[in-house]
């Protein structure tokens, strides 16, 4: 496989049993002033390159595909996630010894995905001919103007995520332009649709008046000569939504590996190729040497090396 060509990148974070306000606030940069940026960059072990002057370029995409400044939604990410879980009737298993904490046996309820790609390609989409060093956290980029190309890429990626997991299950779509490489954080709830259990009774509809509908019991109570005025209609079973990481991402490691591989292929076909980005590689598609090199690296280090 040829590797020295511009490629899309998809990084699937660790599946979560819970989601804190701290994690959500970082994704949405809530409460991040200049001092906060300096403190983040002071942690040399994490190789951070946050640039405060580019904070204003960050944006998010909300329901309906509307682009707004990052962190402008009145309800923060962790609360939106909880609201969706409540809608789905999801209740985590709580730890018997520590009732205020979620048990290790609780099902995973949210998955974070980072969409990105070749550093130069995304920088060109975002900044055009403007020259800037995105790895310099102290550079003054206050006059940099974000270009249309990055909005197009983000919207296409948002539509892809909504098509894949359902717009109502895409809880956050945050695009960061203040780090070394531009990327989109997508926070999702894994949801499957299942048919309702139990028997569904038939309906009897009047031939001349479709609005007149009887249950089986009501139809049987009619005189025999009147029953002929109705036609039988089988009621379709409805569906219910429920949180299920295993049904969406795979029940076994092999299933998840296949899902991730297909995710890369689908993203290339729907989005990547439009922006000159070749198909990316899932972890299982890397060589053993590449796996060893990436195994203990965090997101920021990988971004800095792109």
Regions found by a protein language model. Name each.
Residues 1-306:
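N-terminal nicking endonuclease/strand-transfer module with a His-rich metal-binding environment
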